[in-house]
C-alpha cells in the first residue's frame, strides 16, 4: 500500500496527525506495532492538559491547543473527550519545594502563561481536602484534564472517517532510502509500504 504520508505509531500523536492530514486531503497510512491503537502511554496517563511545569519550549504549542483546540475538540471529533478546564495545583511543603515551584511559575509566566504562586491556605480554599502540610503551591487556572482514551480514539475514528488507513500489528523495523530520501517502510512481518512522495512522519521513531 502506498500513501503520501506514512505515520509510524498509532498513539494520540499519530492519530491526531492522521486526522489533520486526512482533513486536508492527504492520503495517510498509520502503522501501529501493537495489536491495538493507543496501546501505550497515550491512553494510560493522568490526562493532564497543562501548561504549568512544562519545558518553556513546549509552551507555544500547548498554549495554542488550550486556547484553540481542546475547548472544541469534542465537537471536532464527534466524541466526548471529557475535557474540563478546572485549573492545576502543584504543591509544596518545604522551602526547597517553594523555590522549585517559583522557578517553574516564573518561567511559565514569562512565556505568557496565567500562573502564580499561592499560599497553602489559598490552595486549601481551592481544594479543601489538601493536607495542612501544604505550605505553598503554583496555581494555573487555565490548565485542565481530559480522558486520554476518548481523545485518542476520537482522533482515530475521525481520521478513518476522513479516509486515513490504519494497520495494527505492523512493527516497523527499517526505513529504506531511495535516491537519498526515505521512501519505504519495512515491517517485522516483511511487508513493505511505500511513500508516494517524500513525506515521512515518525512520532515513535525512538521505539522502533
Question: Where are the language model's segments positioned?
Answer:
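A short, glycine/Asx- and small/polar-enriched loop/turn
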Residues: 96, 127-134, 176-183
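Helical element adjacent to the flavin cofactor pocket in flavoenzyme catalytic cores
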Residues: 142-189, 193
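Conserved small/polar residues in nucleotide/adenosyl-binding loops
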Residues: 198-204
Amino acid at each position: 500500500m502506498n500513501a503520501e504520508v506514512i505515520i509510524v505509531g498509532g498513539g494520540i500523536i499519530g492519530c491526531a496527525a492522521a486526522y489533520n492530514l486526512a482533513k486536508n486531503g492527504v492520503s495517510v497510512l498509520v502503522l501501529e506495532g501493537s495489536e491495538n491503537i493507543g496501546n501505550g502511554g497515550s491512553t494510560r496517563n493522568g490526562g493532564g492538559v497543562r501548561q504549568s511545569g512544562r519545558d518553556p519550549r513546549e509552551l507555544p504549542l500547548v498554549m495554542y491547543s488550550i486556547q484553540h483546540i481542546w475547548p472544541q475538540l469534542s465537537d471536532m471529533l464527534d466524541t466526548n473527550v471529557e475535557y474540563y478546564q478546572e485549573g492545576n495545583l502543584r504543591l509544596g511543603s518545604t522551602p526547597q519545594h517553594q523555590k522549585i515551584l517559583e522557578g517553574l511559575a516564573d518561567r511559565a509566566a514569562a512565556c505568557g502563561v496565567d500562573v502564580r504562586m499561592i499560599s497553602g491556605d489559598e490552595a486549601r480554599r481551592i481544594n479543601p481536602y489538601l493536607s495542612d502540610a501544604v505550605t505553598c503551591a503554583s496555581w494555573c487556572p487555565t490548565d485542565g484534564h481530559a480522558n486520554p482514551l476518548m481523545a485518542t480514539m476520537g482522533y482515530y475514528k475521525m481520521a478513518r472517517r476522513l479516509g486515513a488507513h490504519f494497520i495494527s500489528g505492523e512493527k516497523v523495523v527499517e526505513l529504506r532510502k531511495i535516491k537519498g530520501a526515505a521512501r519505504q517502510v519495512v515491517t517485522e512481518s516483511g511487508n513493505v509500504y511505500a511513500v508516494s512522495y517524500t513525506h515521512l512522519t515518525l512520532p515513535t521513531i525512538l521505539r522502533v
